[in-house]
UniProtKB/Swiss-Prot annotation:
InterPro entries: A-D-PHexomutase_a/b/a-I, A-D-PHexomutase_a/b/a-I/II/III, A-D-PHexomutase_a/b/a-II, A-D-PHexomutase_a/b/a-III, A-D-PHexomutase_C, A-D-PHexomutase_C_sf, A-D-PHexomutase_CS, Alpha-D-phosphohexomutase_SF. Mg(2+) binds at residues 100, 240, 242, 244. This is Phosphoglucosamine mutase. The gene is glmM. Its cofactor is Mg(2+). The active site is at residue 100. GO terms for cellular component: cytosol. Keywords: Isomerase, Magnesium, Metal-binding, Phosphoprotein. It catalyses: alpha-D-glucosamine 1-phosphate = D-glucosamine 6-phosphate. Catalyzes the conversion of glucosamine-6-phosphate to glucosamine-1-phosphate. Activated by phosphorylation.
Length: 447
């Protein structure tokens, strides 16, 4: 069997690729593998707003109960709430049912260990081995030893209170727009900002099971960009479906991506003496403009492979406190063990208030190099063709020579979809756009 787990859990089209049977198997194997000691294990289960969440939750919970574990149902809460509440409630593990920013037909199952971290590859492989062994040695308790399901009604409130306490100021006097992507943040984000005194304007906070991420949220921020200007807001935030990431919009309606957010937060933490070793952890996809800006502030960058799990690994290795991705996954390790869209939004808003400057002013210290990202749809078994085909390899070398050190080519297979991402950076937008599309078309012609 191929590896079940991708870069962000098990993901696929719900009911064909990610079936109720697979969810049951993951619940049963996961509860068994992640339980330490002889006590009755407690596993938290949450979901985003997509229609398939009910089906997968029912199956997953059945699997958990079948090995005698307790399933604590959190309902619809953001992914980072699961990471936080797993620690807060002293659970053995947490599970989030979500496909994050993917369209509604997708769903996913992602595990957290008892410390709120995503699982290591070894633990994921251990879960898969149990499933492949047809649950050899896994108990099937009967009678009073079976597991029970319990609904935790305070989950959303507990997470929201935690997020609010990560900033030292209230937000009175600020006008803030939120795009909740019809996803998991539709209650918590609005409540947190209103409780802190902000004047809040909200769009896409009416999930119906089918409209998550649909032309909204961090993958489609255009509506929010217009809305911020229309309502005269100081800034806005767009979350993705499970709210583990967010992007910002300044008062002029300009999109502020994760690179700018990281620069802003790193610079502020350095100023107040809280940026460990003056170091920020980012991925190879971060813009070269971030390197230049951070150098000017005396901030060092550690770079990892793409994926917030690799950022987190680097952060925990050396106890760095801030890291993230251009896509808006930002990890504040002093507060949470995963990317947290609400915590990120609150940090940015509090910095804007503390500095008494507009978001556009605060971001003007960084200049982005033009960057083009083109997705080429490639079957999973052909994702490495860019490394193996001599014509593609030569084309990449030619582009790098043309860029002459001011720019770069980065090709990355997606860990969750049948895509290869072709990214070019350089000084001339039109030139790199043409080269990126040419390279993507060359890759497509070879499959």
């Amino acid at each position: 069997m191929d590896r079940m787990f991708g870069t962000d859990g098990v993901r696929g089209i719900a009911n064909t690729e990610l079936t109720a049977q697979i969810a049951y198997n993951l619940g049963r194997a996961g509860a068994y593998v992640l339980t330490e000691g002889a006590h009755k294990p407690k596993i938290l289960v949450a979901k985003d707003t997509r229609i398939s969440g009910d089906m997968l939750e029912s199956a997953l919970v059945a699997g958990i109960l079948s090995v005698g574990a307790e399933a604590v149902i959190l309902g619809v809460v953001p992914t980072p709430a699961v990471a936080y509440l797993t620690r807060e409630y002293n659970a053995d593990a947490g599970v989030m049912i979500s496909a994050s920013h993917n369209p509604v037909e997708y769903n996913g199952i992602k595990f957290f260990n008892n410390k709120g971290y995503k699982l290591s590859d070894e633990l994921e492989d251990g879960i898969q081995k149990v499933i492949e062994s047809d649950f050899e040695g896994v108990p099937s308790p009967i009678g009073i030893d079976l597991g029970r399901e319990r609904i935790e009604v305070a989950a959303l409130e507990d997470y929201t209170e935690f997020a609010k306490q990560t900033i030292p100021y209230n937000l009175k006097g600020m006008k803030i727009a939120l795009d909740c992507a019809n996803g998991a943040s539709y209650k918590s984000a609005v409540k947190a900002f209103r409780d802190l005194g902000a004047d809040v304007f909200v769009i896409n906070d009416n999930p119906d099971g089918t409209n998550i991420n649909k032309n909204c949220g961090s993958t489609h921020p255009e509506e929010l960009m217009d809305y911020v200007v229309k309502k005269g807001c100081d800034l806005g935030f767009a979350f993705d479906g499970d709210a583990d990431r967010c992007l910002a919009v300044d008062e002029n309606g300009k999109l502020i991506n994760g690179d700018f957010i990281l620069m802003l937060c790193a610079n502020y933490l350095k100023e107040i003496g809280k940026l460990k070793d003056d170091t920020l952890v980012v991925t190879v996809m971060s813009n070269l403009g971030l390197d230049i800006a951070c150098r000017g502030f005396g901030i060092k960058l550690e770079k990892t492979k793409v994926g917030d799990r690799y950022v987190l690994e680097e952060m925990t290795k050396d106890n760095y406190v801030l890291g993230g991705e251009q896509s808006g996954h930002v990890i504040f390790l002093d507060y949470n063990t995963t990317g947290d869209g609400l915590v990120t939004a609150l940090q940015v808003a509090s910095i804007v208030k503390k500095k008494e400057k507009t978001l556009s002013e605060l971001c003007s210290v960084m200049k982005e190099l033009p960057q083009v990202l083109v997705n080429a749809t490639v079957p999973n078994d052909k994702k490495n063709i860019y490394l193996e085909d001599t014509e593609i390899v030569e084309a990449i070398k030619e582009i790098e020579a043309k860029l002459n050190g001011v720019g770069r080519v980065l090709i990355r297979p997606s860990g969750t979809e049948p895509l290869v991402r072709v990214m070019l950076e350089g000084e001339n937008q039109a030139e790199i756009d043409e080269m990126a599309h040419g390279l993507a078309n060359l890759i497509l012609s070879k499959i």
